[in-house]
Amino acid sequence: MLSPTNVDAVRALDAWPEWPGHALALIGPEGSGKTHLAQAWDQAADAVVFERGMELSALEGRPVLVEDVDRRRARDEALFHLFNMAGLKGGGLLLTARKPPVQWKTDLPDLRSRLNALTVTQLGAPDDALLRKVLEKFFRERSIRPGEEVYQYLLRRIERSIPAAREVVRRLDEAADEQQRGISRVLAREVLDGTLELFE
């Protein structure tokens, strides 16, 4: 789903394996779609998702995805080795985080220089067009077809994030089922305002 807030990031990811240094940082706030885009790249590149305790030698010659680098800090030495392996034939490294690499903490000077030189692509919070597409997708997954007034109401009221869109669709579906009502602007208002109790 392309929109002005993610088109540059999508193009940057699509440029793999031609990334400078065979590595890229995908940066954006929570709920901006980093995980969705990273997983799409992971599948397209047949990458390995890095987890603590993995044997680094098993990752040689493979593209590697490391998510939330700035929140669940990987060992400096492991990250440095992943950078080195990214340059090998068949390798590649995608790192996701909320903060840019220049703000990541490290005590290893060689890793600091790699982070400072890392190509970065940025995601913004979803705009109306992207959030609309996301809402449509989540409603479609539940076989729900709300009217235009529901979309317009939700776009004015919900937090600008993909998890928030998923959660409001879930809550509306549960409320409609519990109350034996169709999904309408009135139901959306009741759910968002908290005036409708889902469970007694």
Where are the regions a protein language model picked out?
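Dynamic helix-loop-helix/coil hinge segments at AAA+ ATPase domain boundaries and subdomain interfaces
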Residues: 1-7
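Walker A/P-loop nucleotide-binding motif
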Residues: 21-37
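Post-Walker A helix-loop "phosphate-sensing" segment adjacent to the P-loop in P-loop NTPases
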Residues: 42-53, 60
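Conserved nucleotide-sensing/catalytic segment adjacent to the nucleotide-binding pocket
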Residues: 58-97
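C-terminal helical "lid" of AAA+/P-loop NTPase domains
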Residues: 152-156, 163-177
